[in-house]
Amino acid sequence: MWVTRLLPVLLLQHVLLHLLLLPIAIPYAEGQKKRRNTLHEFKRSAKTTLIKEDPLLKIKTKKMNTADQCANRCIRNKGLPFTCKAFVFDKARKRCLWFPFNSMSSGVKKEFGHEFDLYENKDYIRNCIIGKGGSYKGTVSITKSGIKCQPWNSMIPHEHSFLPSSYRGKDLQENYCRNPRGEEGGPWCFTSNPEVRYEVCDIPQCSEVECMTCNGESYRGPMDHTETGKICQRWDHQTPHRHKFLPERYPDKGFDDNYCRNPDGKPRPWCYTLDPDTPWEYCAIKMCAHSTMNDTDLPMQTTECIQGQGEGYRGTINTIWNGIPCQRWDSQYPHQHDITPENFKCKDLRENYCRNPDGAESPWCFTTDPNIRVGYCSQIPKCDVSSGQDCYRGNGKNYMGSLSKTRSGLTCSMWDKNMEDLHRHIFWEPDATKLNKNYCRNPDDDAHGPWCYTGNPLIPWDYCPISRCEGDTTPTIVNLDHPVISCAKTKQLRVVNGIPTRTNVGWMVSLKYRNKHICGGSLIKESWILTARQCFPSRNKDLKDYEAWLGIHDVHGRGDEKRKQVLNVTQLVYGPEGSDLVLLKLARPAILDDFVSTIDLPNYGCTIPEKTTCSVYGWGYTGLINSDGLLRVAHLYIMGNEKCSQYHQGKVTLNESEICAGAENIVSGPCEGDYGGPLVCEQHKMRMVLGVIVPGRGCAIPNRPGIFVRVAYYAKWIHKIILTYKAPQL
């Protein structure tokens, strides 16, 4: 017996009303389409419009401010006398043109138009289905067994109730296969055979159609949802998830619409999702039957030298730059990782050879030293260094070659369009006769070689991939007489045998990755941190998982809650080639107070006298099993490069970009966790960051002084970045 039969009528009405008013929890997968930005449902073709050759085809146009507004009206067919399948946004006139056709329709042709962007509803151009195929609106009209479909508005030979007027929005047009009720089996139709009432159509799943080679770095297909069915976020949008993978910043990564891609060396393609609680997920793309890469997809393979970033290096070097042996790729000791031969099948992760599977700056490996997780194999020479116009001498101020791309692959912009910016940071009139077209040049006497403007607001300028000519010994710093101090940050390196410090070190930064301390750093300006490149081995790293903690003494922030400042990192600027430096742009400026301050940079090219006592700071490995997590300081003295080389038994030759410091008697020095942190010296009552801690041979080894990046050598580059990188960074 039903309980409702026993209820008085008024009580029953009250219960029903209460049930109707209860909030309905819609699962994300079902509700996301209504909430998401409708532009995700369109495929964009830049600088393209559609021209109708059939005069009977209709067009609707109206002035609107954005493509998003055009998309909303197209999806809802609001105020349109037809079913909208595509639209064009006129960027110059801020006008929408809606079409009942698309580029696949007869009587229509594509045409180039610089001010136009064409957006086509994916449901009408997709030749595969997602899930049950409820959104499929393609033109297949034959069943799985080959029978022609019956038109939906016809009752011959089969009568039915699936009339187009009864299923608005389901596009029951012509005799195309559809799934208006979202039933199992996928799109179907009534057949033209009187003996067969209906049958499913043979339309494949998109996950079956799409395939990839290797790890999918070269995948450029239209998969736009994750393996759990979540719709991907457009790469040119910053909601619901902010990210750095902007199409204009990475023009070679194929960031079209919201399609799955693999820009950062993950095991397979992925995307950000429209679910606010799920930042990203992998996509379900199978391996191609013959999983071989085209010649155009393969990096140039070399065995004796590296080309570009060394992604094609297949040699047998198996130590990092300072001689520490590499850990085997198929081993999880001493360092656990997921960059295994199984996950990166095409990257030749054999033995313990140096490789670059993830698009880092150069080949690298995990090391066999438990205190040093990764290291670069920078001792591998570059390929094709010649003595002609492909290289430069000195600092490259006389380079007159025709290269017009930056080291990150961006095309250089014309010099004559950037003269105002150039005048802003140099104090003399540049030689305009040398500034040809958009060729790499060095008009400001940059110590680190030719460069160019890019036209990209996120990367205003960058160095060009040109090496110094072989055998060139021209010094890049002419005068080395000025007092110097440098500042830097490091990766997980810890000051061994240091003492706890409560002195004024408000410029010390703890860099966190997912709340775990990985490196130190120095606050050199309110919005800028100096640290080590080894803390960010991949240029394509997503920065949203990184934070900078300032004003703390305890690495976990215990007892520092009132003075602690936690800031997001929005941009990573790599230093000149071989510098091991990185500048981090903060999402907002740090607030300077009694606990947070900046530290000074040294003068460019300066030196500091030998035996000057300096200090290194860090939260890294301490030599103790149970670390207290407190900031430590170790006092070292400056040592001349020649003497430093002797302590290293002649195995290390220091150059003008390095500085050496060691402890007098006890075993003190930086270790993993301290990387990126500063070597701080005082001169003329001014404290400066003279060096940056980078990985070395071992950790606080007796009679083995530390080698630091010499900040004074890169001081002009640091000032140039701070002056020119003014645009908001994402």
Curated annotation (Swiss-Prot):
Q: Name one GO biological process term.
A: negative regulation of apoptotic process
Supply the alphabetized keyword list: Disulfide bond, Glycoprotein, Growth factor, Kringle, Pyrrolidone carboxylic acid, Repeat, Serine protease homolog, Signal
Entries under CDD domains matching the protein = KR (cd00108), PAN_APPLE (cd00129), Tryp_SPc (cd00190)
Could you tell me which residue ranges the Kringle domain spans? 128-206, 211-288, 305-383, 391-469
| Domain (PAN): residue spans on this chain | 37-123
Q: How is it modified after translation?
A: The single-chain precursor undergoes proteolytic processing by TMPRSS13 resulting in an active two-chain form. The single-chain precursor undergoes proteolytic processing by HGFAC resulting in an active two-chain form.
Q: Which residues form the signal peptide?
A: 1-31
The yes or no answer to whether the keyword Transport is present is: no
Question: InterPro entries annotated for this entry?
Answer: Hepatocyte_GF, HGF/MST1, Kringle, Kringle-like, Kringle_CS, Kringle_sf, Pan_app, Peptidase_S1_PA
Modified sites of kind Pyrrolidone carboxylic acid: Q32
Q: Which domain of life is it from?
A: Eukaryota
Taken from the UniProt record, the cysteine pairs bridged by disulfide bonds within this chain are C70-C96, C74-C84, C128-C206, C149-C189, C177-C201, C211-C288, C232-C271, C260-C283, C305-C383, C326-C365, C354-C377, C391-C469, C412-C452, C440-C464, C487-C606, C519-C535, C614-C681, C644-C660, C671-C699
Write down any Gene Ontology CC term.
extracellular space
Glycan attachment positions: N294, N568, N655
Peptidase S1 domain: residues covered: 495-723
GO MF terms here are: growth factor activity; signaling receptor binding
Similarity-based family:
Belongs to the peptidase S1 family. Plasminogen subfamily.
Query: What is the role of this chain?
Result: Potent mitogen for mature parenchymal hepatocyte cells, seems to be a hepatotrophic factor, and acts as a growth factor for a broad spectrum of tissues and cell types. Activating ligand for the receptor tyrosine kinase MET by binding to it and promoting its dimerization. Activates MAPK signaling following TMPRSS13 cleavage and activation.
PANTHER family noted in UniProt: HEPATOCYTE GROWTH FACTOR (PTHR24261:SF8), PLASMINOGEN-RELATED (PTHR24261)
Subunit architecture: Dimer of an alpha chain and a beta chain linked by a disulfide bond. Interacts with SRPX2; the interaction increases HGF mitogenic activity.
The protein's name in its UniProt record:
Hepatocyte growth factor
Its encoding gene is what?
Answer: HGF
